[in-house]
């Protein structure tokens, strides 16, 4: 059975939650063994897949979980706004570390390596390709190039202002066009994740609301301070 077919079964049985285990950089939680522990806890709680950044984190996680891992490498480049899996060597390193799916930036922005070249390299390793997109045009272009999974990950992050709510319209547009969509980006409540599924998402990735304690504490502190002012 193909990995996509296996995921279809898991999603039908468990609901389609993917947990992104990416601690705040330099957080006390930003250690491979802690990332792996969070991933294992998420798997035991019913997550159908895990999203992991960084080769060391992926290696540690691969050793303890059996669910599929979506692997990425983030870089801050001087000559490109693209941050997610920008180079061939990133793809190779993630493949060697045990990723099942490799996600890349799928936006139409200046980049060191073309999207189609990165997709071809992912497929060279026999892995599934996911593209993190920001617009319908991004997603449809990546689908035509052969990406099996389209993520709404970068919606709101390629423009000057980032909205507070997730982009359900993008999920629906891409789903209606025949894309296998992972909704991602600002899904901070179970209700929002459920809305994404109702709008046609294949699965939903949740990160900050589950694995970034600093963000969750800030949300509570902000709300509670407003209540007593």
UniProtKB/Swiss-Prot annotation:
One GO cellular component term: cytosol
EC numbers: 5.1.3.9
Name of the top EC class for this enzyme: isomerase
Gene3D superfamilies the record matches: Aldolase class I
NCBIfam families, sorted: PRK01130.1 (NF002231)
Family listed: Belongs to the NanE family.
Summary of the function given for this chain in its UniProt record: Converts N-acetylmannosamine-6-phosphate (ManNAc-6-P) to N-acetylglucosamine-6-phosphate (GlcNAc-6-P).
Protein name listed in UniProt: Putative N-acetylmannosamine-6-phosphate 2-epimerase
Gene that specifies this protein: nanE
């Amino acid at each position: 059975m193909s990995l996509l077919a296996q995921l279809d079964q898991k999603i039908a049985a468990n609901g389609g939650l993917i947990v992104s285990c990416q601690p705040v950089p330099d957080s006390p939680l930003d250690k491979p063994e802690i990332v792996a522990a969070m991933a294992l806890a998420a798997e035991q709680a019913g997550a159908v897949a895990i999203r992991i950044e960084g080769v060391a984190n992926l290696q540690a996680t691969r050793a303890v979980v059996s669910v599929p891992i979506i692997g990425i490498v983030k870089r801050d480049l001087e000559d490109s706004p693209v941050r997610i899996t920008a180079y061939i060597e990133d793809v190779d390193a993630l493949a060697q570390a045990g990723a099942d799916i490799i996600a890349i930036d799928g936006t139409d922005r200046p980049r060191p390596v073309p999207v189609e070249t990165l997709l071809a390299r992912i497929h060279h390793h026999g892995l599934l390709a996911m593209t993190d997109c920001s617009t319908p045009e991004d997603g449809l272009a990546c689908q035509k190039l052969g990406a099996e999974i389209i993520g709404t990950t970068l919606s709101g992050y390629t423009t000057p202002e980032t909205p507070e709510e997730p982009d359900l319209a993008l999920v629906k547009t891409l789903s209606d066009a025949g894309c296998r969509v992972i909704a991602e980006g600002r899904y901070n409540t179970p209700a929002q994740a459920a809305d994404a599924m109702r709008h046609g998402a294949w699965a939903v990735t949740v990160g900050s609301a589950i694995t970034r304690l600093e963000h969750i504490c800030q949300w509570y502190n902000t709300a509670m301070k407003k209540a007593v002012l």
